Regions:
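Perimembrane helix-loop-helix junctions
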Residues: 267-303, 393
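Interfacial juxtamembrane loops and adjacent helix segments
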Residues: 85-133, 196-207, 327-363
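Membrane-interface alpha helices of multi-pass inner-membrane proteins
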Residues: 224, 245-261, 268-269, 293, ...
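Transmembrane-helix motifs of polytopic, lipid-linked glycan transferases
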Residues: 151-183, 224-229
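Transmembrane-helix signature of polytopic, membrane-embedded enzymes
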Residues: 170-201, 221, 238-245, 399-402, ...
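Start-transfer (signal-anchor) and selected internal transmembrane alpha helices
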Residues: 2-71, 188-191, 244, 286-298, ...
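Hydrophobic, aromatic-rich transmembrane alpha-helices
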Residues: 359-364, 370-401, 440
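Specific aromatic-rich, kink-prone transmembrane helix
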Residues: 218-238, 249-254, 268-270, 436-440
Length: 511
């Protein structure tokens, strides 16, 4: 028997074993999330570990992202060296004088006509190259690693770290929500949804981990922990002192997200309904005002530092460098945010963001990139679940109504920002909102479970767990699509080998 056939039997064997474990009669659907035993703790830890490994290990496969052929993907490493040298620009020694001489160096047609040599996807201002991606990862990982080891941290390793911390944040947040609000939630549904929603949120970073996804993974990592701290402060902590302490850390991680990827940081608006819940039964006093000011102080401190950083580079505290990009479009004349707003065009782009459809491919792995709800139909669950009177009643009882409404609105706001500022909407931009919709889906699923009889709850847990597992499989197929210089883009022969393994050596060739 060939190795290809053995590998195929093994993979399909694992597939059916997992389906067997998720069968309707499985004990995973009868044990609740509150169960306390050594076996459940080990199972949870094993699931978390396997999820992290599933997402982190494949990041090293593509030479464009693992450091073998860095091209322009090593900007974080270069900026770290620039900081150590005492300046904010990336010190390239090959700046083309023709680029400086152009009246508008940001016009791609003008650059092509003048045959200009330049560094792709950098910000260029006053004769210097800058990195316009969020600077916070430099201070969190790249600089400490460089100072401690004397070596540069390869960019994709930072993405691996942020991704692992994000996944740990998802499992922690979902567990806390389950213990607080969803006493009837089964252990199996908690584990499968935590795994699936972690993978859905970061699958693109697994495929193309360096630079762009370093900033994105850092931002979603900061935000998921910000949500964890804020929700714990409002719904779990029993003392004001504990609540303010957790709110401070929520503010700190939420503020740092602005220095990673600003559109994702718009999720900080989730603080507003949480604050309303916190203040509802409290009398506002001078002491409470001081406590809230302390809790919010990281927003002010980080905001001031980011504005100073922007001003030092671009003479504008609100300019992150987007207007000075050397890329596919001239963004220097985009004007104000709302001057670019065209109702019909913007509406069309937002629709494509969420429900855009691309026909399936006739080549392995057959899937194509679609809008969020077509990529992963499981994420449409909240739009149906919210129609249940039982779900709405649970929302009111747990004071979650405003919070859930905010989670419906925030993805639209982030999508609106993405489609207005970007010259074209790319697949990686959907990472900005996947995690929020996943959180919303978990909340609605948990609330729905509370109104079911034990028998119906087991069936619901089984069906949704299997759906979550199949969504993970869809992520694997999307990872295999040759795109954006990823692993299968470089190694077509590897894609063909994977096809043969999954099809047990049968079927026609890729080409």
């Amino acid at each position: 028997m060939s190795k290809t056939l053995l590998a195929g039997y093994f993979i399909w064997g694992v597939f059916f074993v997992i389906l067997f474990c998720l069968r309707p009669g499985s004990v995973l659907h009868t044990i609740t999330i509150e169960a306390k035993s050594r076996n459940t703790r080990w199972l949870s830890f094993l699931t978390l570990t396997m999820t992290i490994l599933l997402c982190v290990l494949p990041m090293s496969l593509s030479p464009s992202y693992n450091g073998e052929k860095p091209d322009y993907m090593n900007q974080y490493e270069l900026l770290t060296e620039s900081f150590l040298e005492g300046h904010l620009y990336i010190d390239y020694d090959d700046i083309d004088p023709k680029l400086i001489a152009l009246d508008n160096p940001y016009d791609p047609e003008a650059r092509e006509a003048a045959d200009v040599s330049f560094h792709w996807d950098h910000a260029f201002y006053n004769g210097h190259y800058y990195m316009y991606f969020g600077v916070v990862p430099v201070f969190l990982l790249f600089l400490p690693y460089r100072l401690l080891t004397g070596m540069s941290l390869t960019t994709y390793h930072a993405t691996q770290i942020f991704t692992a911390l994000f996944i740990a944040g998802v499992f922690s947040l979902f567990y806390m929500l389950g213990k607080t609000f969803f006493k009837k939630l089964s252990l199996g549904l908690y584990l499968t949804l935590s795994t699936a929603f972690s993978v859905i949120s970061v699958w693109y970073a697994v495929s193309a981990p360096a630079l762009y996804c370093t900033a994105i993974s850092a931002a979603v990592c900061m935000e998921i922990w910000s949500f964890f701290f804020f929700i714990r402060a409002v719904f779990v902590c029993e003392t004001d002192r504990g609540s303010i302490r957790y709110a401070f850390f929520g503010s700190l991680t939420g503020a740092l997200a602005f220095g990673c990827r600003p559109p994702i940081a718009l999720a900080n608006l989730f603080v507003l309904p949480l604050l309303a819940v916190y203040l509802k039964n409290r009398k506002f006093t001078f002491r409470l005002g001081k406590q809230l000011l302390f809790a919010a102080s990281p927003y002010m401190a980080v905001g001031v530092l980011l504005m100073l950083y922007n001003y030092a580079r671009f003479d504008n505290p609100f300019e992150f460098g987007q207007a000075y990009q050397l890329t596919i479009a001239d963004q220097s004349h985009y004007g104000s945010f709302f001057s670019r707003f065209q109702p019909l065009k913007t509406f069309d782009s937002i629709c494509k963001f969420f429900v855009g459809y691309t026909p399936m491919s006739d080549q392995f792995p057959f899937v194509s990139f679609n809008g969020i709800l077509l990529n992963f139909p499981i994420l449409a669950l909240p739009f149906f679940g919210i129609a249940s009177e039982g779900v709405r009643r649970e929302m009111r009882e747990h004071k979650l109504t405003r919070c859930i409404m905010a989670l419906f609105c925030i993805p639209l706001l982030i999508a609106f920002t993405d489609v207005l500022w970007a010259p074209t909407v790319l697949e990686r931009y959907r990472m900005d909102v996947y995690w929020i919709i996943c959180l919303l889906c978990f909340l609605i699923a948990g609330l729905y479970c509370q109104n079911l009889t034990p028998k119906t709850a087991r069936k619901f847990s089984c069906l949704l767990s299997i759906w979550a597992f199949l969504s993970i499989c869809k992520c694997v197929l999307l990872f295999l699509v040759p795109y954006d210089y990823n692993f299968t883009f470089y190694y077509v022969q590897a894609l063909e080998k994977i096809r043969k393994i999954l099809m047990l050596g049968r079927g026609v060739g890729l080409y």
